[in-house]
């Protein structure tokens, strides 16, 4: 009796949740490469991006999104919320990422957005490795699931890559039988230029922590190949002179540290030597100016 192989499946899955629950860490873990920057600061992800996770059984095109939140005062917050909601258009399924042991109003908001979209929702309970009392997990899952419908529920640790195989198996069941949309070596739809800017922004968040002004973004002014060398020029935009001084640091030491670590990350990701220059410039009110946001690459 001959064995029949399972059909190949391929489809898109939106990764949704409130800020700082580990959506980007989960996306990177599933893709197997760094396509989305990560920090402890909420709202690290500001753009929709595709992470392409390819397995022998199929391919998942993951739409990593900005965290859904209630803050609507700044234009940047409104644009990011619209981007998160817009990521649900045309997807086959969605992942709602929450933090183990915690459910708040923003989690409820994210669930309502997914319910309105009418797509199958897989609940991913992340950071289970941080639970001090492991016996509290099952009562928490029962509480969250009460009155809410999920296609599957998966406790995971995205950081430690625990519980991901079972999650992938259930996600592949929710996408259609189809050929892969991308080549097996492709991991994202974003350009190297975009990723370079994100790596600088990641180091800004990691080096400055709570000192980092919220209204900070990065624009890549130059990205050029010079033989085996990549020459990259990055502008860090802030809204006030005082913020500029914070980013530069005493004697330029902080900016040098940011640039040095971002360059190493770029060389690792791009597989090439990088010459990186960084500047800090001021543009007042850019984070509440939709035209400026569009110029800096923020879109819905």
From Swiss-Prot:
GO terms for cellular component: cytosol; plasma membrane. Residues 64-67 are annotated as: G3. Residues 156-158 are annotated as: G5. One of its GO terms (biological process) is ribosomal small subunit assembly. SUPFAM superfamilies: P-loop containing nucleoside triphosphate hydrolases, Prokaryotic type KH domain (KH-domain type II). Pfam families: KH_2 (PF07650), MMR_HSR1 (PF01926). Residues 17-24 are annotated as: G1. GO terms for molecular function: GTP binding; GTPase activity; ribosomal small subunit binding; small ribosomal subunit rRNA binding. CDD domains: Era, KH-II_Era. It is found in: Cytoplasm; Cell inner membrane. It is a peripheral membrane protein. This is GTPase Era.
């Amino acid at each position: 009796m001959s064995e029949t192989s399972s059909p190949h499946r391929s489809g898109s899955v939106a990764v949704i949740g409130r800020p700082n629950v580990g959506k980007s860490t989960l996306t990177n873990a599933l893709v197997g490469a760094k396509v989305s920057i990560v920090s402890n600061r909420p709202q690290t992800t500001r753009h929709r991006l595709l992470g392409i996770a390819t397995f022998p059984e199929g391919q998942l095109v993951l739409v990593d999104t900005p965290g859904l939140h209630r803050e609507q005062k700044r234009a940047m917050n409104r644009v990011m919320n619209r981007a998160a909601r817009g990521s649900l258009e045309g997807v086959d399924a969605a992942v709602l990422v929450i933090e183990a042991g915690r459910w708040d109003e923003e989690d409820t908001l994210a669930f309502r957005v997914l319910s309105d979209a009418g797509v199958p929702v897989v609940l991913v309970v992340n950071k289970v490795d941080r639970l001090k009392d492991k016996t509290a997990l099952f009562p928490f899952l029962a509480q969250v699931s009460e009155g809410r419908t999920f296609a599957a529920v998966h406790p995971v640790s995205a950081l430690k890559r625990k519980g991901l195989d079972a999650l992938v198996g259930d996600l592949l069941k929710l996408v259609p039988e189809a050929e892969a949309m991308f080549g097996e070596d492709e991991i994202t739809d974003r350009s190297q230029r975009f990723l370079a800017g994100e790596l600088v922004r990641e180091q800004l968040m990691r080096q400055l922590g709570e000192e980092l002004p919220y209204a900070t973004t990065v624009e890549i002014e130059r990205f050029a190949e010079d033989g085996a060398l990549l020459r990259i020029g990055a502008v860090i935009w802030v809204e006030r002179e005082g913020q500029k001084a914070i980013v530069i640091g005493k004697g330029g030491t902080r900016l040098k540290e940011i640039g040095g670590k971002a360059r190493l990350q770029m060389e690792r990701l791009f597989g090439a030597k990088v010459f990186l220059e960084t500047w800090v410039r001021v543009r007042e009110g850019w984070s509440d100016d939709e035209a400026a946001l569009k110029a800096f690459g923020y879109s819905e």
